[in-house]
């Protein structure tokens, strides 16, 4: 079976994708520097799958260490998750984000090219659709960004497109995903960010386990069914399967394709909160706060291309996502 290098493989989406790859019979190599993940995730991946893999603790900015991976292993394709991902922090520390995300990716591309590995699945984001496109978002819409994090995703997409133009032997999949939540049904891995969470679900989880007094709901006066922001939430296991399909695709096709991974349906903050209340069996206090600048009222994906190209579509509904999130957090109240 092909050998897949997964950068950021100990992180939330990375760890679930590693489980999917191992269960599908792939050999994997994980590279991570634990900047936003924990070593325990690697043990949990082994426990879930009963399989072993090679691991390198490496920062992508360290070209020498990075090249060592390619020197010591025959790598057939790369799934590139590694990167900083907090929107607010990117606004406060843009240079840190541009340096880490873009330079790290350039180093990776350099190493790949040097060792003749020209197949990559890149972890992009729905943020590249910017603030003005109508919904649902379709892959051929114009792209833009509103913060440094979004710009790093957009720039990396452009870099990879340019790499393909310069060398048509490359196979590149740009996966634009929406709002991943949920956790592996075993409850062994899930979202466990280092530091302040960036997403809605970890905050709801913290309220549910008593670490946070109440949930802050940013704005209830949007033009949406219940006034709160609407997003396309996708189960992380569906997302992991999407990466599996993308890897199969790049192993067999040359070219560059941007593909949405979402459910194609929007859920509001209150939808998610009430679904989670069902899962944990209690009411969770919340407080409506002013809107956050830059937040969009609603967005969700058009997912036809993923079905067409990969034969992939999301399977899990919101109640399953929140049930699996609760299962993970109740088994791991203090994280991994």
For the regions a protein language model found, what residue spans apply to each?
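Short, basic/glycine-rich phosphate-binding loops at helix/coil junctions
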Residues: 182-184, 221-222
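N-terminal Rossmann-like NAD(P)+-binding domain of SDR-like oxidoreductases, especially those catalyzing
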Residues: 1-183
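Catalytic core of nucleotidyl cyclases, primarily class III adenylyl/guanylyl cyclases
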Residues: 186-188
């Amino acid at each position: 079976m092909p050998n897949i290098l997964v950068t950021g493989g100990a992180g939330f989406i990375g760890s679930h994708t590693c489980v999917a790859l191992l269960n599908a019979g792939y050999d994997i190599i994980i590279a991570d520097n634990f900047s936003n993940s924990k070593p325990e995730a690697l043990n949990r991946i082994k426990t879930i799958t009963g399989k072993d893999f090679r691991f390198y603790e490496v920062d992508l900015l360290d070209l020498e260490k990075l090249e060592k991976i390619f020197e010591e292993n025959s790598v057939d394709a790369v799934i590139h998750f590694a990167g900083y991902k907090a929107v607010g922090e990117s606004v406060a520390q843009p240079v840190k984000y541009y340096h880490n995300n873009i330079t790290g990716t350039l180093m990776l591309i350099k190493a790949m090219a040097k060792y003749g590995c020209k197949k990559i699945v890149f972890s992009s984001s729905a943020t590249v659709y910017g603030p003005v496109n109508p919904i649902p978002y379709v892959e051929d819409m114009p792209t833009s960004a509103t913060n440094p994090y979004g710009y790093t995703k957009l720039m990396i997409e452009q870099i990879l497109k340019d790499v393909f133009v310069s060398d048509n032997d490359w196979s590149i999949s740009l996966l634009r995903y929406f709002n991943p939540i949920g956790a592996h049904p075993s409850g062994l891995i899930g979202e466990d960010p280092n530091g302040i969470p960036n997403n809605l679900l970890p905050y709801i989880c913290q309220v549910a386990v008593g670490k946070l007094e109440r949930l802050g709901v940013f704005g209830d006066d949007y033009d949406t069914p219940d006034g709160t922001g609407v997003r396309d939430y996708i189960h992380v296991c569906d997302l992991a399967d999407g990466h599996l399909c993308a890897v199969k695709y790049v192993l067999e096709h040359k070219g560059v394709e941007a593909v949405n991974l979402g459910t194609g349906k929007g859920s509001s903050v209150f939808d998610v909160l009430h679904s989670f209340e069902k899962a944990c069996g209690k009411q969770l206090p919340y407080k409506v706060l002013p809107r956050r600048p830059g937040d969009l009222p609603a967005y969700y994906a058009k997912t036809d291309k993923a079905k067409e190209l990969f034969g992939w579509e999301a399977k899990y509904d919101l109640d399953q996502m929140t049930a699996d999130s609760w299962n993970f957090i109740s088994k791991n109240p203090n994280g991994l």
